[in-house]
Design a protein with these regions (language model features):
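C-terminal and inter-domain tail/linker signature
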Residues: 1-134
Length: 134
């Protein structure tokens, strides 16, 4: 079984110590317009999102097939319930190749995306999130 650290997620995977990232693992997902590129950018975006969670309850976190890792959890952001599924795929060298982060339901996803745009205001990351009032 592969040992993994998902960019600072506070999950069982985080405590396993896997930190091998290529120069630009793209991060895509339902919250984002476009892809976030680069390990530092991905860490900032994921870390910023985690800071807004009031709570996080894991349903599953573990290997998915031969070259992937998946997390399924529910969280709460300012009282709004939100569900998430994160899929990380690895290349032949065992490094993260692609990260997909999807949230549900749509109303919570839109609320969370607007909060993240506010959080990242003045940074290059803000443009990836939904504009408008929270």
């Amino acid at each position: 079984m592969r040992e993994i650290d998902l960019l600072g997620f506070h999950s069982a995977a985080t405590r396993r110590g896997w930190t091998s990232w290529p120069a630009t693992p793209p991060l895509e997902g339902s919250l984002l317009d476009g892809a976030v590129q680069g390990a530092d950018a991905v860490r900032a975006v994921i870390g910023g999102a985690r800071q807004l969670y009031d709570r996080q309850d894991f349903n599953f976190a573990g290997p998915w097939g031969d070259n992937s890792f998946i997390e399924d959890y529910t969280a709460e952001v300012r009282g709004a319930p939100i569900g998430a599924v994160h899929l990380i795929t690895f290349n032949a060298d065992g490094k993260a190749q692609h990260i997909i982060v999807n949230y549900r339901p749509l109303s919570s996803l839109m609320f969370f995306s607007r909060l993240l745009r506010e959080k990242f205001a003045g940074t290059p990351y803000a443009e990836h999130y939904l504009a408008g009032e929270v």
